Amino acid sequence: MLQQPSPPLLTNSRLHIGFMPDSEGLNRQILESYLQLREQDFLRRSHFFGGRYENLYFDRERIPAIARVLEQAESYAQNLLQQANNLRSGFWINDMGSGESTTEHDHDEDDEMLSAVYYVQAPQDSGNLVIVDSHSRTLLTPQAGMFVFFAPSVVHSVSVNRSGERRISVGMNFGPMSKQ
């Protein structure tokens, strides 16, 4: 009997998870600064779905403690991409209230090489990160202090926040440093 080759396995090994050291106090500082922002502090907003803007952009100086998160994320990104000091990054806040969700999307819009999310506040039942591919869905329960890195082409969403509290995360994209 001739043995036919097996079809390729479908895997979902596209996620890389890390944790921010000493995140509890840091997240408290980020949250306190974020809650003091006013309308005029936001540079822009994007992705208006379900009555809210999913992405809120601001100068990093408005939340000084966020610098540590961005530095740690860049270190992880340099390691994952094997690109020392050749990366630029962009970031935004996603503030998801009770009953809200984030629509299915990807980050493959420009020259991004890696995307990430960092969880500042992720109460129990505040919505799972849903990673979608053509054959499966992977649910990841967020934790405050957790980073999740993935390719920009990975389609993902966030399920409904049923916690009664806000879920606050920082989205990030990493790309090549522009040549000038």
Residue ranges of predicted features:
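Double-stranded beta-helix
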Residues: 132, 172-180
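Residue-level marker of positions within ordered structural domains that often coincide
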Residues: 35, 121, 175
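Residues at secondary-structure transition points
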Residues: 56-57, 122, 177
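Catalytic core of non-heme Fe(II) oxygenases with the double-stranded beta-helix
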Residues: 85-149, 153-159, 165-169
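A general structural signal for short secondary-structure boundary/capping elements
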Residues: 63-64, 159-166, 175-178
